[in-house]
């Protein structure tokens, strides 16, 4: 039996970043069983709050936005429609695009898909768009990479510190990959043990699915690493003095 080649977990999650946040509210809108969510958050007097209208130094979080919402955001904030749509395409590659009035950062984030009562692991794009006055996130579905910020479970998070927020998102993303990689590693060992005592195809198929997840994760993490390296060289991303502090 061929054994899965497991990547070095520490090597795959090398991101030179720290993390951090406070309290938040949640609002959802459903349409034909699919959630379309646009939420706006802002740090007010040291705490994170959900607000009704965009303001300077706010965070606009868009989950599976409609075509109308994308067009409205594009018209209002001068962001290209294609750049707002890009994170909604599962085939989009991780990259950085620097425009005149904003910067688009695309990275892959891990996700869980349930099939046949089992959890399988894959990746979807997350877009981070940084303008001079605010920051946007765009994703096809709610991701645990961002929910910690929304649920008030990250300390010292401030929407006006855009560079720090980006690095916090990337750090959170790396920790989620590490968490899922450990689960995949453990599941692989369990399935391999079953294979020694069984000749059924079920275990072989499960092992192949886990191997596919590892390939997705490995490819995505390498692409994300390239994005991070380029990000640290982008002059349009303002560096705040506080961003260099070590947060514990």
Model-derived features with residue positions:
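Peripheral, non-transmembrane regulatory/ligand-interaction domains of membrane transport proteins
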Residues: 2-247
């Amino acid at each position: 039996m061929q054994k899965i080649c497991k990547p070095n977990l520490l090597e795959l999650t090398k991101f030179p970043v720290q993390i951090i946040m406070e309290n938040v509210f949640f609002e959802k809108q459903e349409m034909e069983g699919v959630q379309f969510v646009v939420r706006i958050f802002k740090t007010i007097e040291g705490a994170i709050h959900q607000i009704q209208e965009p303001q300077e130094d706010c965070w606009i979080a868009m989950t599976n936005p409609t075509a109308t919402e994308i067009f409205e955001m594009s018209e209002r904030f001068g962001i290209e429609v294609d750049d707002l749509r890009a994170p909604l395409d599962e085939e989009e590659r991780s990259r950085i695009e620097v425009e005149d009035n904003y910067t688009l950062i695309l990275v892959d984030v891990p996700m869980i898909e349930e099939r046949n009562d089992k959890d399988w692991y894959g990746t979807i794009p997350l877009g981070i768009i940084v303008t001079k006055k605010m920051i946007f996130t765009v994703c096809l579905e709610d991701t645990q990479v961002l929910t910690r910020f929304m649920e008030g479970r990250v300390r010292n998070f401030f929407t006006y510190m855009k560079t720090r927020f980006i690095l916090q998102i990337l750090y959170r993303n790396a920790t989620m990959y590490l968490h899922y990689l450990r689960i995949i590693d453990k599941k692989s060992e369990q399935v391999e043990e079953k294979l020694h005592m069984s000749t059924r195809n079920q275990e072989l198929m499960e092992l192949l699915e886990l191997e596919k997840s590892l390939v997705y994760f490995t490819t995505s993490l390498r692409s994300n690493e390239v994005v991070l390296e380029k990000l640290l060289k982008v002059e349009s991303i303002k560096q705040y003095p506080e961003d260099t502090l070590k947060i514990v």
